């Protein structure tokens, strides 16, 4: 009797683990599909707003890989683009950074991590995922929301 009860418990635990794993995979796939929907804005749990303008067809970056990007950044004021503060496109010089290592603002690490090479995306980054209360170099004021148009050109 005890052996049968023990066996039932093990089987129930195995079923629960499989359901948890499958459910997690389904939820992850649904989240990725939602993030990849062209023209539809999504907001992540952190408050980052993402809108794909062109879904890429290449690889998705892995932590530590170098992302080769073009970008243009503006202040985001009253629901619209404000003053442009930087652009690799204008310079004709792509920007490179290792993803997921904290070398860029949090909004970039989060917003670029699910892109595919060839993709273009708009990121609306709240201050806490950008430069926060300190701002940046007299160009970005304290507590500024930022908007970036980014393009993942390649991975190294």
Report each predicted region and the residues it spans.
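Cross-family detector of peptidyl-prolyl cis-trans isomerase
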Residues: 2-156
